């Protein structure tokens, strides 16, 4: 990971082309043809715009082009000027970027966790670059309705591996959900945890938390039932169980349009598993989605479950078939944060 201030640069902006994509040589010629515009002259460090323009124009940040926003006004599609490599750039206030990225700095690299490739520091903004992704797990499950067991096992193992690595490294993730995992390849065979910005850094072995952070559909019963502390790692594991169930069944184990009714179902911890799932898949789901936190598998124990070593082509050819079913995995606008319900 490179963290540095580059030499002084001139920031140029260009109106967006009618075409969604533009040839990089064309952008280069436009830049040389138009008069340059310095947004912060006479500074000894790079002077990126305070925030890349929200009207979908192109901004030059060091050796990168920042293109259209991907999420709000702080996540952008970016392209390396020389190699043409496509990346994702997140923009932070310079005063708080280290705090926001602290979990990234204290955790060793892992193949299933998104890695920072470079950080550029301006006067007021930090520009953090990540490798590009190819969609997220939530959208993938919505499109597929549900996954075959063999595919679900391959992807869920990677998801659980990322969570286990975080737990071993002293991090509790708190807001785990399918949307947090993104694909590393166009074939949708490799996934990674998109960010650690919501993670909590533990001080020692005690993983007790007291906040009500998370997404309603993925929240664990003990978070709803207690006004005191709870095990952050066990709550993460519950969220893993919700993810696995959703991948295999095509809907959440607990769902209701009314938050109060949804929370009542989660508190009871009762759910139905379709008979079409294999015995090992049912066993793993039940071993994770247990009301009592101490009875759940740990993230590391999940990785040792025999479901992952199943020869699906031989013993489970009849399980997990993609039958027609109602699509019950909601769109993004139904994935609200838990916080407002407890304020």
Curated annotation (Swiss-Prot):
InterPro entries: Kinase-like_dom_sf, Prot_kinase_dom, Tribbles/Ser_Thr_kinase_40. Residues 29-45 have a biased composition (Polar residues). SUPFAM superfamilies: Protein kinase-like (PK-like) (SSF56112). One of its GO terms (cellular component) is cytoskeleton. Gene3D superfamilies: Phosphorylase Kinase, domain 1, Transferase(Phosphotransferase) domain 1. Pfam families: Pkinase (PF00069). The keyword Glycoprotein does not apply. The protein kinase domain is predicted to be catalytically inactive. This is Tribbles homolog 2. The keyword Cytoplasm applies. GO terms for biological process: negative regulation of fat cell differentiation; negative regulation of interleukin-10 production; positive regulation of proteasomal ubiquitin-dependent protein catabolic process; regulation of MAP kinase activity. Interacts with MAPK kinases and regulates activation of MAP kinases. Does not display kinase activity. Belongs to the protein kinase superfamily. CAMK Ser/Thr protein kinase family. Tribbles subfamily. Keywords: Cytoplasm, Cytoskeleton, Protein kinase inhibitor. It comes from Mus musculus. Residues 25-50 are annotated as: Disordered. The gene is Trib2. It comes from the Eukaryota. It is found in: Cytoplasm; Cytoplasm, Cytoskeleton. Residues 61-308 form the Protein kinase domain. Its main location: cytoplasm.
């Amino acid at each position: 990971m490179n963290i540095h201030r580059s030499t002084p640069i001139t920031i140029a902006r260009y109106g967006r082309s009618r075409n969604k994509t533009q040839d990089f040589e064309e952008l280069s010629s436009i830049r040389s043809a138009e008069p340059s515009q310095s947004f912060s002259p006479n500074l000894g460090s790079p002077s990126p715009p305070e925030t890349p323009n929200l009207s979908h124009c192109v901004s030059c940040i060091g050796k990168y082009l920042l293109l259209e926003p991907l999420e709000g006004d702080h996540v952008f599609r970016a392209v390396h000027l020389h190699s043409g490599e496509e990346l994702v750039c997140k923009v932070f206030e310079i005063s708080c970027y280290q705090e926001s990225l602290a979990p990234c700095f204290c955790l060793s690299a892992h193949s299933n966790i998104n890695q920072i490739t470079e950080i550029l520091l301006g006067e007021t903004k930090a520009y953090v670059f990540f490798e590009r992704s190819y969609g997220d797990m939530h959208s993938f499950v919505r499109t597929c309705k549900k996954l075959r067991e063999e595919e679900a096992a391959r992807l869920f193992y990677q998801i659980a591996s990322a969570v286990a690595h975080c737990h071993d490294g002293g991090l509790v993730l708190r807001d785990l959900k399918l949307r947090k995992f993104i694909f590393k390849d166009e074939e949708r065979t490799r996934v990674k945890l998109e960010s650690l910005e919501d993670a909590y850094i533990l001080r020692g072995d005690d993983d007790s938390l007291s906040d009500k952070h998370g997404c309603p559909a993925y929240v664990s019963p003990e978070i709803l039932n207690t006004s005191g502390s709870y095990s952050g790692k066990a709550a993460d594991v519950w969220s893993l169980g919700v993810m696995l169930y959703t991948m295999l069944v095509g809907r959440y184990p607990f769902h209701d349009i009314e938050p109060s009714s949804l929370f009542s179902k989660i508190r009871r911890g009762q759910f139905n598993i379709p008979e079409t799932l294999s015995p090992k898949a049912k066993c793993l789901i039940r071993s994770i989605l247990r009301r009592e936190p101490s009875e759940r598998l740990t993230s590391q124990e999940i990785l040792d479950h025999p479901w992952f070593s199943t020869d699906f082509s031989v013993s489970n050819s009849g399980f997990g078939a993609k039958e027609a079913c109602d699509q019950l995995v909601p769109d993004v606008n139904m994935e609200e944060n838990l916080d407002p319900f407890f304020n």
